[in-house]
């Protein structure tokens, strides 16, 4: 009789341990995935917007040091007088209010791919499950560009 009870106790203990071991991965899968986008130009802002549109459960954070984005594509219309600078200046507030994107007004300075964290200039660390790099281009940093133009 004792061995029968002990066997049931061991089976129950094993089942409890197995359930406990499985609950961590299940819990991790049920947590909202975190996507961090570095760069708020056309590419970064578009990725942030559409990830939220396709799956509103995903937490999207956009890291961008500038308060708004000036559309270089539309700059010819400013030169001709058809539009003003305010017309081609896009604010990141729309991503926050319309799509639920978390905007971090800071500069990304380091990426820890093992720990899955982005460090910002102000000392924040932002965790991610998926990372999108869309920093754009800095024409001033292209060697020889000034002398070529």
Language model features with spans:
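FAD-binding core/adjacent interface of flavoenzyme oxidoreductases
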Residues: 2-14, 20-32, 103-149
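A generic secondary-structure boundary signal that marks alpha-helix termini
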Residues: 18-19, 56
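Beta1-alpha1 glycine-rich phosphate/pyrophosphate-binding loop at the start
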Residues: 29-102
């Amino acid at each position: 009789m004792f061995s029968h009870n002990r066997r049931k106790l061991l089976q129950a203990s094993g089942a409890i341990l197995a359930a406990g071991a499985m609950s961590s991965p299940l819990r991790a899968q049920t947590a909202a995935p975190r996507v961090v986008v570095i760069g708020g130009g056309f590419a970064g802002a578009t990725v942030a917007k559409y990830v939220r549109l396709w799956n509103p459960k995903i937490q999207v954070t956009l890291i961008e040091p500038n308060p708004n984005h000036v559309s270089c594509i539309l700059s010819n219309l400013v030169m001709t007088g058809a539009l003003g600078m305010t017309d081609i200046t896009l604010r990141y507030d729309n991503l926050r209010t319309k799509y639920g994107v978390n905007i971090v007004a800071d500069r990304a300075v380091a990426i820890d791919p093992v720990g899955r964290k982005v460090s910002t200039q102000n000392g924040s660390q932002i965790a991610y499950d998926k990372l999108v790099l869309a920093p754009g281009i800095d024409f001033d940093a292209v060697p020889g560009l000034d002398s070529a133009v």
